[in-house]
Amino acid sequence: MSVVFVAASKLPTPFGVFTMHGFLDEATGKEHVALTLGTVDDGAPVLGRLHSECLTGDALFSLRCDCGFQLEAALRAIAAEGRGVLLYLRQEGRGIGLLNKIRAYKLQDAGADTVEANERLGFRADQRDYGICKPMLEHLGITAIKLMTNNPRKVKALEGAGIQVTERVPLQTGLNPHNQKYLATKAGKLGHLLGSLHQGEVETPTGS
């Protein structure tokens, strides 16, 4: 794997002062980031999340997905724990890129679900590659993680890379009328573990 560490700096946020570690995937040219809080290289399991880039949800407050809500909830949880890691992976639109994501949204506006839209554009339902996580975690000295995710594929990917997942921590937040079908599709077609959140129980999003 051609992922190399480039530089690190402090990153003050509303949730605490994190350390931001920058990585470059030399094979793709993509730049990835890890945020850490506290001591994470002591061998004890670290609360963490693998978060794929979502410009619309993370930065533009979109209600079409739950990404922005999950990002905030994960950072809040790490801050409450006092230590943890968040890998921010530049895999926009489940790996299809921003412009193709907008094309997929247009198909969804016409009635397709999130999986059907990707497939009509010639992509797999999920194109993300979590192999980039191993060298990032190795650089940070993390060998065991309590993973905040609803996606069993992330657990399997980390375990397959030799990272011990000691616990899966559900991260269910952000359900609203605009993303109800999207979440139901993630549960029904992508195997995400969303409990009652895809059974028609719509909550008012709070962001945490």
From Swiss-Prot:
The active site is at D126, R128. Keywords: GTP-binding, Hydrolase, Metal-binding, Nucleotide-binding, Riboflavin biosynthesis, Zinc. One of its GO terms (cellular component) is cytosol. GO terms for biological process: riboflavin biosynthetic process. GTP binds at R49, L50, H51, S52, E53, Q70, E92, G93, R94, T114, T149, K154. InterPro entries: GTP_cyclohydro_II (IPR032677), RibA (IPR000926), RibA-like_sf (IPR036144). GO terms for molecular function: GTP binding; GTP cyclohydrolase II activity; zinc ion binding. Its EC number is 3.5.4.25. Zn(2+) binds at C54, C65, C67. Binds 1 zinc ion per subunit. The keyword Transmembrane does not apply. NCBIfam families: PRK00393.1, ribA. Catalyzes the conversion of GTP to 2,5-diamino-6-ribosylamino-4(3H)-pyrimidinone 5'-phosphate (DARP), formate and pyrophosphate. This is GTP cyclohydrolase-2. It comes from Azotobacter vinelandii (strain DJ / ATCC BAA-1303). The lineage of its organism: Bacteria, Pseudomonadati, Pseudomonadota, Gammaproteobacteria, Pseudomonadales. The gene is ribA.
